[in-house]
Structures are given as C-alpha cells and as structure tokens.
Amino acid sequence: MQTREVKMFNIARIDLMKGRTNANLDELKNILLANYDNRLSDVIDDTSFEDSVCPPNEICDQIISEMITDFKAATDEDLVIANYWGHIHEKNMSTTLHNHFDAYVSAVCYVEVPKGSGCIVFRPRLNQYNNSAYASRFDPEKGVYYMFPGYLDHFV
C-alpha cells in the first residue's frame, strides 16, 4: 500500500474568553438602575434604545482593568476601551441577533442574574445553509464576563 502525505489546516477559529470579576457588583447594579431611563438613543427602533448610560465609575474601571489584564495574559495583546453601557433585561426580555462590527473585541459582564435569565448565544456565520449550525450558548452567571470578537453575532 502506498503511503500518502495529507495535511489538515484549520481555516476558521473563534476564541471566546470567560473570566470573573472581583468588583462590587451590588454597588454597580445600583448605578445602572439609577441610569436605566437615561437611554443611549431616544429612537425606539434604534438598537441603542435598549442600552442605558453607565457613567464613569471606579467599579467599571476595576472590571475593565481585570478584562484588559486577563486578555493580555491570554493573547499577549493590548486593548483600549472605546465605550461601555448598561443593558438591563426585564422579565421575558430578549435581545435580537446583532454584533459590534466596529469593535475588535466586545465583552459582556453579568452584574445580576435573576432566576430564569436567558442564555447568551453566539452564532458565527460559518454555514451559509444553516445559521445556527455552530451556535454556542452560555448560561449567565453573576460576576462572569465573556470577551469575544466584535464581529461575532450574538443574542439573548
């Protein structure tokens, strides 16, 4: 039998990083709730209508610092934070499929997770015939954050 030389190449890989913050999330929750009605957009069909202003504060600074440190340790890359906001789901709310195409890295940090909270689902566009073929879902956990490529479609 003739031996054949075969090589395999990985042409698609998407990394998602999971970490945990040590920040005072109860205090951050109060800051976010106090700004709940201070929307990033007043236009109801704008995706930013669901998002609230999160004023600069030491708790967010700590979380961002932890994320930057963890990302650097995992990738040896430096990050610069462009912006952040609050996103509060009331009971039975969801977020439509979207991405942050203009960001190199995006992140979400769970400040509080009531019973019955929805999973975050990441859906890469790797199969043109089945958009959910490579979907991955993660249960929300208080204090946990996920960092992922800005182009990665996701929803709750």
Tell what function each PLM region has.
Residues 1-77:
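Non-heme Fe(II)/2-oxoglutarate
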Residues 80-147, 151, 155:
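Catalytic core of non-heme Fe(II) oxygenases with the double-stranded beta-helix
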